[in-house]
């Protein structure tokens, strides 16, 4: 007697055929496989510390240490300032650091390399550690090529799937959007070199900063008045990606009321979600609105919170610059972390009408003034009719869409 041994699908390519709904392909992969394989978590009522909204969300870090690394005594991708149990060491001005920025000379070494060879970028150190078998990549396979049908997807057209919500796939731009997409009018502020950002893992040498809302007479945390919203995201971005691709994006009711620091920053992601999405407030907004209808928005704070591995979901967002219960740096197990300060869509209603939550370079959640300049990554929902064409979801083989 013979029995077939079921092998769960590893990627969307194994779980779905071209021409099927992208949303159903993702949920099918999650249901047919295991979260430990796919890094997709179904946030139903049985998921511990989850959102409880029946969404399917990707969570975890892109890079993980291998068995070879563990046997060598390296339990983490990054070493802490005073330890040697990580694969990669970071240095600023000749001193070993565990920071996110460096205004002086920076370099990286590999703990297992007795020659202490220096690498100029975090990306280069990662690539060598992967080649040498100490680190694996592509552990979260949620890359999508959007805005291009080229055989090799341009890096500026790479987006990532946050999850599936009410039958719609939610995307965020992988790297920060620059002037070619958002323009230099509206709430454009300045540009910054990426040289000083120790864990920046993108492809750009310069990142454009945008105000959240800098218009003199309406510089408040009211999203409907923001030119980052009305001009840079919902005019320039849509025009620059072209009609074909803009037509694949659904008009969405965004939750823009926000909440207090105590209710967003100083609580676990599940509570952040309730206070940001389910029960937002209108305190300190000027239009008394908790929703706004448009195609393009920015990430929610809770999106970022749940993008980390579940081991981090018992940590408050105010401590996402630290470690989870396993002593692993949370920013190394959160695929959404890119190493540069950036805006969320959610106002901070704690103090006045000028503050909004933002992600800091260290992976922590802070608040900033609406006339501060930070990076921006467009976020949007695809229409439920958008179809899967191919690809496994890795950076080199991103999911492609039927055009």
Give residue spans per PLM region.
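Long, domain-scale functional regions
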Residues: 1-403
